[in-house]
């Protein structure tokens, strides 16, 4: 996972050429042919714009940009679950048919099929990297550490496809440890085995996060000093992450293992595990103002977040060879004319497909001729 000093070739565009939805949110059935360029969705609030890009976010691992329970995603009063199908096009692999959905009724998780063959959600990363900016992220820098940690891990996942499984396996092991401690178990051998797994996975998680932050920082350094979006300085606040690169990984692993073993009584009393990468926080600073992001104005925080995600999108394209698909929900309304123009220019420079939503079509007039425009009303799309 190393960034090059320059982009040797333009990353390949990954584009959704056809999107089909069945019983997804307010879409009973939708079949939408698309060109390779950007897509703009306009319409009133509640019409289904965000629902559509949420469906696209399910073409990546996880629970989508809303992190919703699958039963909540299926259309109300519809039998069964939901289905999403996308025809993708990319020069790296040619055409690909991606399907995902649920059976409904609480029957298992969502299933994934790629070119008709059952696959895992992590396999989706071989075909597309999907990044997003949504209004719920506006409080990222002022909210709880768990939201920033989740944001951090999604950034890592886009450039290190094994990261998601590490995190899931670590959390599963931690839940097992917590359950044993809460049940009053004194099975030291079983606890040792779980803590060994947590130490190995936790150290690997910390190393992947630290590496990703180093690569993102290097990418930010390569961007123009006076760009349209302020540069961010990012730091990891975590016992393991702060020691990555300073101490040997095996020493960190052993130290974390010892911390877990010595902390059993304390963790039993607390009802949870108090040390580990599940406590890490992402600290972001507004570089031009030398100010913590949490203390910046709402507008400055939004610009800082957009700049960080665009830098991450560049890095993702460079490392994967695929320009990411970007989902930008209500983003133009928060930017002045200069920054909107700059954003549209950067999207073209990235070379990927972007889906943008908004209530005011005029904010996207600069994209006329370069994007497909659709009006969304009650789950129905009309080309405009």
Swiss-Prot record:
Cellular component terms per the entry's GO annotation: cytoplasm
Gene Ontology biological process terms, A to Z: DNA replication; DNA synthesis involved in DNA repair; double-strand break repair; SOS response
Primary subcellular site in the record, as a coarse category: cytoplasm
Keyword Nucleotide-binding: yes
PROSITE patterns reported for this sequence: RECF_1, RECF_2
Binding-site list for ATP: 43-50
UniProt cross-references to InterPro entries, sorted A to Z: AAA+_ATPase, DNA-binding_RecF, DNA-binding_RecF_CS, P-loop_NTPase, RecF/RecN/SMC_N, RecF_2
Disulfide bond entries: none
Family note: Belongs to the RecF family.
UniProt xrefs under PANTHER family: DNA REPLICATION AND REPAIR PROTEIN RECF (PTHR32182:SF0)
This protein's name: DNA replication and repair protein RecF
Source species taxonomy: Bacteria, Pseudomonadati, Pseudomonadota, Alphaproteobacteria, Hyphomicrobiales
Encoding gene, per UniProt annotation: recF
């Amino acid at each position: 996972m190393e960034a090059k000093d320059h982009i040797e070739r333009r990353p390949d565009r990954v584009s959704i050429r056809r999107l089909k939805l069945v019983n997804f949110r307010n879409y009973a059935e939708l079949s939408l042919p698309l060109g390779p360029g950007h897509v703009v969705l306009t319409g009133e609030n509640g019409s289904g714009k965000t629902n559509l890009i949420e469906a696209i976010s399910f073409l990546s691992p996880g629970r989508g940009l809303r992190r919703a329970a699958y039963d909540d995603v299926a259309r109300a009063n519809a039998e069964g679950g939901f289905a999403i199908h996308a025809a993708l096009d990319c020069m790296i692999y040619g055409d690909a048919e991606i399907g995902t959905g649920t059976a409904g009724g609480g029957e298992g998780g969502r299933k994934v099929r790629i070119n008709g063959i059952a696959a895992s959600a992590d396999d989706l990363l071989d075909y597309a990297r999907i990044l997003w900016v949504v209004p719920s992220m506006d409080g990222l820098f002022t909210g709880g550490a768990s939201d920033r940690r989740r944001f951090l891990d999604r950034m890592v996942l886009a450039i290190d496809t094994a990261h998601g499984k590490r995190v899931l396996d670590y959390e599963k092991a931690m839940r097992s440890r917590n359950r044993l401690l809460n049940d009053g178990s004194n099975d030291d051998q079983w606890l040792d085995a779980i803590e060994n797994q947590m130490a190995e996975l936790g150290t690997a998680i910390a190393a992947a996060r630290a590496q990703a932050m180093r690569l993102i920082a290097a990418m930010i350094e390569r961007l123009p000093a006076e760009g349209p979006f302020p540069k961010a300085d990012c730091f990891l606040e975590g016992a393991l992450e702060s020691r990555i690169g300073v101490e040997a990984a095996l020493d960190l692993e052993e130290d974390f293992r010892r911390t877990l073993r010595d902390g059993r009584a304390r963790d039993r009393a607390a009802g949870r595990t108090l040390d580990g990468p599940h406590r890490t926080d992402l600290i972001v600073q507004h570089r031009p103002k030398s100010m913590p992001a949490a203390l910046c104005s709402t507008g400055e925080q939004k610009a800082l977040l957009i700049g960080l995600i665009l830098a991450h999108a560049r890095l993702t394209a460079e490392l994967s060879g695929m320009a990411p698909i970007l989902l930008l929900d209500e983003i133009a309304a928060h930017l002045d004319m200069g920054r909107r123009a700059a954003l549209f220019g950067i999207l073209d420079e990235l070379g990927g497909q972007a889906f943008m939503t908004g209530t005011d079509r005029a904010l996207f007039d600069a994209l006329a001729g370069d994007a497909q425009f659709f009006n969304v009303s009650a789950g129905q799309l009309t080309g405009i």
